């Protein structure tokens, strides 16, 4: 049973390179059980400033879970169980545009799903839900993230289309050119889907801070895991500053009428 002091209204899902935000003033680790199995790791819960926050490393500590094997349903369910209303996702991405440079942050507003073999919904029957993904991210949380990044002088692109591939391999040159020229995507990653739509089904406010770590192979610059890791390390301090400042601005719950996230199932259930 989850105790009251193990509740949090804000959740951080850390991606590649961010396995510990390092900004808790006090914290404890808890294990959360879900109907979908175990989340990626223990959840760290504690105080960041005066806010109660839950942190979950998406790939587990030590990056031991590849993107196509992550238990996304368990991760989102566990955060919901802890009382999380706001979910801030942090991800490493590749750039499909030369003007989205290494070290830039992107707050995407759209995505394209090219994944293949994942569990996409909590509603597998007998109850079925068709949630709208027209605007897949919480606009209130996105705007606040953009505003905060500007205040901190972090180079941030205010919109972008994230194409999510299955992984764990990187793209071929032909695929990369297709994502860029045909699909008109701006950034590429492997973990947004189904995390974003599961958060929507859970009626949580969700936004992604995408950190550009490399150019995809259209640029004829080879992509290596080592390069991604190096640039991610350089981005980590900026991410911590942004997370700390953004979290201090978030209210306990979304203001009435500020977004539709908490009503996402209102017209979705069949």
UniProtKB/Swiss-Prot annotation:
Record-listed substrate binding positions: 190, 214-216
An annotated GO cellular component: cytosol
Residues where phosphate binds: 16, 58-59, 91-92, 191
Xref: CDD domains: MTAP_SsMTAPII_like_MTIP (cd09010)
Reactions it catalyzes: S-methyl-5'-thioadenosine + phosphate = 5-(methylsulfanyl)-alpha-D-ribose 1-phosphate + adenine
Residues marked Important for substrate specificity (site): 171, 225
Paired cysteines (S-S): 138-205, 200-262, 259-261
Reported impact of residue 259 to S: Reduces thermostability of the enzyme
Molecular functions (GO terms): S-methyl-5-thioadenosine phosphorylase activity
Pfam families: PNP_UDP_1
EC number: 2.4.2.28
GO BP term, pick one: L-methionine salvage from methylthioadenosine
Keyword set, alphabetical order: Disulfide bond, Glycosyltransferase, Purine salvage, Transferase
Gene3D superfamilies per UniProt: Nucleoside phosphorylase domain
Reported temperature dependence: Optimum temperature is 120 degrees Celsius. Highly thermostable.
Domain of life, per lineage: Archaea
Pathway assigned to this chain's UniProt record: Amino-acid biosynthesis; L-methionine biosynthesis via salvage pathway; S-methyl-5-thio-alpha-D-ribose 1-phosphate from S-methyl-5'-thioadenosine (phosphorylase route): step 1/1
Keyword rRNA processing: no
Quaternary data: Homohexamer. Dimer of a homotrimer.
Function: Catalyzes the reversible phosphorylation of S-methyl-5'-thioadenosine (MTA) to adenine and 5-methylthioribose-1-phosphate. Involved in the breakdown of MTA, a major by-product of polyamine biosynthesis. Responsible for the first step in the methionine salvage pathway after MTA has been generated from S-adenosylmethionine. Has broad substrate specificity with 6-aminopurine nucleosides as preferred substrates.
Family per record: Belongs to the PNP/MTAP phosphorylase family. MTAP subfamily.
Name the record gives this protein: S-methyl-5'-thioadenosine phosphorylase
Organism the protein comes from: Saccharolobus solfataricus (strain ATCC 35092 / DSM 1617 / JCM 11322 / P2)
